[in-house]
């Protein structure tokens, strides 16, 4: 792009000069649109920053010969957040030496640094508190061991001084983390699987299958209002979804193994979807009494319906899938006692998750849902992956723009879902008690443990 902008082709006369000016304008317009659309992603790329500086330098050089480019210069200046105002007169040949020093001093303090961007990103920390369960803690990526340990201690009601934080690396090595150790790298890779232990390295709590106290936790869930739970789930999801940029879907699909931290919000929402599904399973399977288990299933059906009403299809899918997993759906004695009216409601909700005809039921319902709304992201990613893998990016050494247009149309759905032209609004006021519970989900992620609990509740005949 730089050679295209800089090329003068030794033009002669007015027509050639106008042609060069038009070409420069076209390049600057393209760069401005590109930078405006993908600003946050581009600002973290050192190559892009260097390119933008170089282009701006060339533009400043051209101001004397093409003073009508001053509007484009101001637009680019705003994008770079330069504090100093440059004018065409300032870049005349007589002031070239002084100009050069200013050209090379684009105000770096106007550009967010990688560290600043990193420190404002959020992650879901999975902190294992037993062999088969973890506590989910939403935190900044800049969190240190002491800060995370303090949050976990408060949630578990265990004195902080009794706990330590371990990171278990891929080879199985256990690292004892110091209070000020950072838990995430610049690319948001965790130092390892995080475990909270007592100082003698014993477990903080027994496994769920042997923990009588944890098996009484259903009482807390049963006391909560279903609408409040749905509101809290939606507020959490919306706060993340509203920060998802459509470019994240492209990074996730095209360069999943080298995203460089560019898919943080998207991965957070996908992680949350999986977490909510596990939470539904955990709550039902940790309830030892039949009558309470029936009440829990009734509550989750209502919460799923409320999430749908609140236009949160991501949480809606997660709850329905959680109730439909083999470990929960096999509890025939429990499902038999669910009232017929609620069974009918659940059947209608299930129909929306039916994958037949390429999820036609969901797509039709979602199309009719007003914005803002949260889509079921795994399906959206599946659509993009299908386009990407089913079509070549290059045909006869030329870019396949038809493929790129199809991907663009699909990812543009993110922006559409985030729009709120009618003032419908997504976040609502939630109960502090419910928020404290839902924002820190304690779930079992071990499928063997979940099935063991299921068969313990209703043994195979």
Regions found by a protein language model. Name each.
Residues 1-47, 136, 160, 228, ...:
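Alpha-helical solenoid scaffolds in large eukaryotic transport, assembly, and signaling factors
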Residues 22, 61-125, 150-151, 161, ...:
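Intrinsically disordered, proline- and charge-rich regulatory regions
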Residues 66-268, 272-274, 279-286:
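Intrinsically disordered, Pro/Ser/Thr-rich cytosolic linker and juxtamembrane tail regions that serve as
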Residues 2-31, 165-180, 184, 332, ...:
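Interface signal in eukaryotic adaptor modules for cytoskeleton, membrane trafficking
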